[in-house]
Amino acid sequence: MRHQTKKHTLGKAQDQRKALLRSLATELFTYGEIKTTMARAKALRPYAEGIITLAKKGDLNSRRQAAKFIFDKETGKFFDPETSKVYETAEEGKKLVSQTVLRKLFSTISKEYSERNGGYTRIFRLPPRRGDATDMALIQLV
């Protein structure tokens, strides 16, 4: 029996669902907001909020746990680990490393939500998608 098992299956197998949520979470943390279907947005919300909660802890184990849940791709910006500043281009004379989604999550996003106890994302309804009339949504970091 499946009593009290609450998750959105999205009509996909478990491995496909995990890959989809990882991809959506990575894009959400990269751009701050994404446009997707309502069902995917509702499935992404608890997934992304759990990752932000891990980032707020900030220890090594939390970093390793969060690395399992997102793709650690580069964002195209540069990061100064000493001052935690983000630069658009590499500057001369500074030790800059390329900013990845995981670094952005633990350095920038976790500090923004340090005083907040949940509710890190919001979902806006959008007009239905043209073609198949699927309910669309905009999910963004608060």
PLM regions: where:
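Structured, basic alpha/beta domains of bacterial-type, RNA-associated proteins
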Residues: 2-9, 24-142
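Short alpha-helix boundary/capping segments
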Residues: 12-16
